Regions:
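Cytosolic catalytic cores of cyclic-nucleotide second-messenger enzymes
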Residues: 140
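Conserved sequence signature across two-component system core domains
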Residues: 6-7, 36, 54
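Two-component/phosphorelay signaling modules centered on CheY-like receiver
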Residues: 10-34
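Short alpha-helical segment
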Residues: 40-42
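Conserved small/polar residues in nucleotide/adenosyl-binding loops
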Residues: 129-136
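Non-catalytic signal-transmission and effector/linker regions of two-component phosphorelay proteins
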Residues: 1-4
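CheY-like receiver
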Residues: 44-45, 51-126
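Residue-level signal for the "D+5" position in two-component response regulator receiver
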Residues: 35, 62-63, 137
Length: 140
């Protein structure tokens, strides 16, 4: 699973990275994590890498997380987005971009919410059998 953290604060990236590492070890899930300080660099990378899960801070300089998510959605409709912020002010706007979840910082105070977000966003591999059944149904 390709995961990105997009947050301009190194402390917040470190905290989320530790939460992800603990969660993935606990559930024995493989993942690759890439961290970005801003939306522009993230979008450049997202043009080359198919991220399945993105944790996006809303308040960032130059390009906020809402704009970065809007641009990501133009190219990747299936990516799960979890917004990160210190306030719920932009929650409605985030969900208009098909956000999967909305986490408040600091994560240390909202660990149960992080666990819930991961459960909702966890991507399961699609089996070959499922694809074959889907292809057969499409041909009917």
């Amino acid at each position: 699973m390709q995961i990105a953290i997009v947050d301009d604060r190194a402390e917040d990236r470190e905290e989320l990275s530790a939460c992800l590492e603990n969660y993935m070890k606990k559930h024995q899930l493989d993942y690759t994590l890439t961290e970005f300080e801003d939306g522009e660099n993230f979008l450049k990378a997202a043009a080359q890498v198919d991220f399945q899960l993105v944790f996006m801070d809303i308040y960032m300089e130059n390009m906020d997380g809402i704009e970065a998510a809007r641009r990501l959605r133009q190219k990747n409709r299936l990516c799960k987005i979890v917004f990160l912020t210190i306030t719920e002010d932009y929650a409605r706007m985030g969900y208009s971009l098909s956000a999967s979840y909305y986490l408040l910082k600091p994560l240390s105070l909202h660990q149960a919410d992080f666990e819930e977000a991961m459960e909702l966003c966890q991507l399961k591999p699609v089996s070959y059998t499922h694809l074959r059944a889907h292809e057969t149904a499409a041909n009917l």
